[in-house]
Amino acid sequence: MESFIIEGGRRLKGTITPQGAKNEALEVISATLLTADPVRIQNIPDILDVNNLIKLLAEMGVTVTRHGQGDYTFQAAALNLAYLDSVEFVRKCSSLRGSVLMIGPLLGRFHRATIAKPGGDKIGRRRLDTHFLGFKSLGAVFVKDPQRDTYQLRAEQLKGCYMLLDEASVTGTANVIMAAVKAQGTTTIYHAACEPYIP
């Protein structure tokens, strides 16, 4: 087993600026798909998963402007929804766990989403059931295409409801919230995750 050995005896001094949190960044960046207006986000961490999500959004038609280190503006005014059905999109989503967070905003705003089975790190079970059960409660229907390993979700009009999540999933809660903000009526979520960066 590896370990850290820390030798003290020296007074610590100085200041640091912490990097933004990856999970929060993935959620907030995905939430920019909910509007056609420009959204500026600062303190975005410069890490692979986040950078890959930013590139993926740009390829979908989101206008991405980098103002400086960790400082971006996103404008999802002219999305190419047909790109979601492309082989390239499916391949890229399959290697990026954070891509699942685009489902809620796309379903809420455009009433449809096609997303690959996401990849990324493998901590615990990492199920998608919570996401899909939440979307289903809002009125979405989904079909898995086993040949392409994609999920297609459709909803003419999402409707607010009371729902009990089967687990307090952080990404599941965030995804359902992002879909619910575009739903008709009020949504109340029980057994929601309560991390401080839930949108």
For the regions a protein language model found, what residue spans apply to each?
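Structural preference for solvent-exposed beta-strand-turn elements
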Residues: M1-P199
